[in-house]
Amino acid sequence: MLPDKYIQQGSGITYMYFRKFKLRFVDTYKFCLSPLADLRKTYDIKTEKGYFPHHFNLPENQNYVGSYPSIEMYGPKNMSPKANVEFNKWYAEVKNDVFDFKKEFKKYCLLDVELLSKAILTFRQIFQTSKDLDPWRYVTLPSMCKDMFFKKVPS
């Protein structure tokens, strides 16, 4: 099924609407430019982001059950010094446990969805409460701000 409306930006889809289901998809990254781990701090969300060995996510490892993948599989070189310290502490605690790829992948994805859901709901509530404005009526943060400016939404 194809969407009735969509907005494409490069190879990404920013917005999709399915009339039959009254279902709208908006790219939340167009509103919250921070990584998920930072949104957790921004909106005081208790859900932990967790760690996942993205470099280990290869077709041949999809059914892997065994020792935890090496530290390099988690991309520690891409972490901030503070995040790296936290990661190393976590890794020291789990490295001798059994790593079940499917179980860990599912857990990591569910935590991402939970964290993003809480962040965007909090973001929405802040604007609805302070500006009487629903950000999800817009496709991007700049389009919302433009509307606020021209409608002179009270500050």
Residue ranges and their predicted role:
Residues M1-S155:
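Metal-dependent nucleotidyl/phosphoryl-transfer cores and adjacent nucleic-acid-binding surfaces
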